[in-house]
Structures are given as structure tokens and as C-alpha cells.
Regions:
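Active-site-proximal alpha/beta segments of enzymes that process anionic O-linked groups
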Residues: 1-117
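A long, amphipathic alpha-helix that forms part
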Residues: 74-79, 115-143
Length: 143
């Protein structure tokens, strides 16, 4: 999902335009942005922080060891929905299928095998493809 209406042709206007989260806030919605990624000083961070509630769950552990699956975001969604706001807009920033693919889904979601963790080397191409395909299946299930 795009966070603003900026295109490649007018990218510099990103500094002057409001994002979609702000648009929903101005329309009277309670807004939330939940991310399964770390802060990286990007526009995702910039627009996400416009929300009433903003949580980057990988930052919660502090030491970098926390590697939650995207399902962990659903706990935050449930808590936010329990607030019973009459109008809510929730954005989920998932980890999806970023490398290392095998870390993007629980072991019980491994359908294509072998998928054991490997380095990104040509000799492991089949394992990498299997792990990537499993991550796509898991994301599809998540959505």
C-alpha cells in the first residue's frame, strides 16, 4: 500500500504532502500503524509516525534478537480493535518475503521442501526458491 500520492516524477513533493494516515486522521478516524520491521529512517517511518498509535515491534526487544513472524502484528490489531473506536484505520507493515526467506514463516508452514536455511549461493538455488515460495504462501495465509 502506498503511503502517499507522490510519484517518481514529483518525488520531492513528498516533503510537502500529507500521507494517507493523516488523511484518515483528518476525516475523524483513529489511526494505527504497526510494523514488523525496524526503524530505518525511511518514509515508511515518517508516514507511520503520523498515526495516533505507532509500534515497530522489532524495536520492542531492543537487542535485535527479536524476530517475530508477521502474525505477531495481529495481536496489536486485536488490541486496537478492542478500543472500539467508531472509525478506525489500521496499517500493517509486514516483513513479508524479505531475505532470509526461511525466517519469514513458522516451520509448520513449510510446504515446499527442502527449505533449510542456507546462504544466498547458486548451489542452494532450489532451497532458496522453496523457502521463498513458502514465505509467499505464508503471507497469502496471513492476508
Amino acid at each position: 500500500m502506498l503511503m502517499s500520492s507522490v510519484t517518481a516524477h514529483d518525488f520531492n513533493s513528498i516533503y510537502r504532502q500529507k500521507g494517507i494516515i493523516t488523511a484518515f486522521k483528518e476525516a475523524g478516524y483513529r489511526t494505527a500503524f504497526f510494523s514488523n520491521q525496524r526503524y530505518n529512517h525511511s518514509f515508511i517511518d515518517f508516514f507511520g509516525k503520523e498515526a495516533d498509535i505507532c509500534d515497530f515491534i522489532k524495536e520492542d526487544a531492543g537487542d535485535g534478537s527479536y524476530n517475530p513472524s508477521d502474525d505477531e502484528l495481529l495481536k496489536l490489531v486485536a488490541a486496537e480493535l478492542a478500543e472500539n473506536a467508531s472509525k478506525q484505520f489500521i496499517v500493517l507493515h509486514t516483513y513479508g518475503s524479505h531475505f532470509n526467506y526461511r525466517e519469514r514463516y513458522p516451520a509448520d508452514h513449510a510446504f515446499f521442501l527442502p527449505d533449510f536455511p542456507v546462504d544466498a549461493e547458486l548451489k542452494y538455488k532450489d532451497n532458496l526458491i522453496n523457502a521463498y515460495d513458502n514465505s509467499i504462501r505464508y503471507t497469502d495465509n496471513f492476508l
